[in-house]
Amino acid sequence: MQLKSDMKRVEIFTDGACKGNPGPGGWGVCLHFNGETREFFGGEPVTTNNRMELLAAIRALQELESLEDNGQQHLQVQLHTDSQYVQKGISEWIHGWKKRGWRTADKKPVKNEALWRELDDLSQRHQVEWFWVRGHNGHAGNERADRLANQGVESVLSKKAD
């Protein structure tokens, strides 16, 4: 493992959006690395807000593989989300879920287990710090991710109209 000072830093903002819950949803990612900004979004026709929040974080961490292809490894990632579900889930709750065989404290199956497993796997590949940011509070990175997530919703709705 490299020392923190040797690692390349990546700052990521993610967001999910849903019109109805469940309903058409979208996710958005704004990634800053080495003076470059990458923005991308997507969506699903029938989903939930929590699935979209998780998918945004997953897509963001998957994008890091393209940075690795360019020789960037051992990335120090600061991932900002306005979803306490994602932030607390990946940094606090997941440890108990795994110990209990992907069950919650009250012995119910963890919702979105496949997405949580994927997020857990991806987050192990780098040094990821998870930050919660209050949504719709004027934070530029979060506001941009929110706009991208809404573009994801619109892309799904426009496909339905075709």
Swiss-Prot record:
The keyword Transmembrane does not apply. Residues 6-154 form the RNase H type-1 domain. Disulfide bonds: none annotated. Mg(2+) 1 binds at D15, E53, D82. Keywords: Cytoplasm, Endonuclease, Hydrolase, Magnesium, Metal-binding, Nuclease. GO terms for biological process: DNA replication, removal of RNA primer. The keyword Metal-binding applies. Mg(2+) 2 binds at D15, D146. GO terms for cellular component: cytoplasm. Its cofactor is Mg(2+). Binds 1 Mg(2+) ion per subunit. May bind a second metal ion at a regulatory site, or after substrate binding. InterPro entries: RNase_H, RNaseH-like_sf, RNaseH_domain, RNaseH_sf, RNaseHI. Pfam families: RNase_H. It is found in: Cytoplasm. GO terms for molecular function: magnesium ion binding; nucleic acid binding; RNA-DNA hybrid ribonuclease activity. Monomer. PANTHER family: RIBONUCLEASE H1. Endonuclease that specifically degrades the RNA of RNA-DNA hybrids. Belongs to the RNase H family. This is Ribonuclease H. It comes from Nitrosomonas eutropha (strain DSM 101675 / C91 / Nm57). The lineage of its organism: Bacteria, Pseudomonadati, Pseudomonadota, Betaproteobacteria, Nitrosomonadales.
